[in-house]
């Protein structure tokens, strides 16, 4: 048995030093805005585009990473807009998907739409939320750590992944975009 001091002297003499992980200080900024969960209020959906849910799912295919963001109408479970990216953490998949949804919304400018999402950093970001009121879209968010609040979207994500891998038998990365044509 060797004492701690003796071990320290031996390591110092031999030039052995531990490498510690350096903590990077993050300056506190504005906290993300959390919106109430409007789906829990018994929202009555009587027609299309009244309540749209969104979520992002990630998957690997032949060594490549993909992120797929979907926007789905709760009235008829129709995929209204989607965006696919091969870059991890790409915020533009959310924005491109939202732009597709806004194009549909422009056809019915007076209709108030509820967009229900999780509390992800992009969905709660300032730039994402500044776009919504411009097009008469009300934001609703799931409770933290509760994916069952957005169960319809989570189920569609699981179903799409199962379809991609089990039914389409994808063999190369080029076919992923062809496969997503069937999502529309």
Which functions belong to the PLM regions below?
Residues 1-47, 146:
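Basic, flexible linker segments flanking DNA-binding modules
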Residues 7, 11, 39, 55, ...:
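Mobile genetic element proteins and their domesticated derivatives, centered on retroelements
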Residues 45-80, 84-88:
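An active-site-proximal beta-strand-loop segment
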Residues 63-64, 124-126:
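Catalytic cores and conserved motifs of cyclic dinucleotide signaling enzymes
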Residues 83-108:
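Active-site beta-loop-alpha junctions of metal-dependent nucleic acid enzymes
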Residues 108-123, 147:
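Acidic/histidine-rich, metal-coordinating catalytic segments
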Residues 129-133, 145-148, 152-184:
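Charged alpha-helix within mobile-element recombinases
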Residues 137-145:
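His/Asp/Glu-enriched short active-site or ligand-binding loop at hydrolase and phosphoryl-transfer sites
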């Amino acid at each position: 048995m060797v004492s701690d001091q003796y071990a320290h002297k031996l390591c110092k003499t031999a030039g052995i030093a531990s490498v510690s992980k350096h903590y990077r200080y993050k300056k506190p900024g504005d906290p993300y805005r959390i919106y109430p969960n409007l789906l829990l209020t018994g929202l009555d959906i009587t027609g299309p585009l009244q309540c749209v849910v969104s979520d992002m799912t990630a998957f690997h295919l032949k060594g490549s990473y993909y992120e797929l963001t979907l926007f789905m109408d709760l009235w008829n479970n129709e995929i209204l807009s989607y965006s696919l990216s091969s870059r991890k953490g790409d915020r533009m998949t959310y924005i491109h998907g939202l732009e597709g949804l806004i194009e549909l919304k422009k056809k019915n400018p007076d209709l108030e739409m509820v967009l229900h999402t999780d509390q992800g950093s992009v969905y709660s970001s300032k730039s994402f939320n500044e776009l919504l009121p411009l097009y008469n879209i009300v934001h609703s968010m799931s409770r933290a750590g509760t994916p069952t609040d957005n169960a319809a979207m989570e189920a569609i994500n699981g179903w799409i992944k199962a379809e991609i891998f089990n039914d389409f038998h994808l063999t190369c990365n080029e076919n992923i975009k062809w496969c997503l044509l069937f999502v529309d």
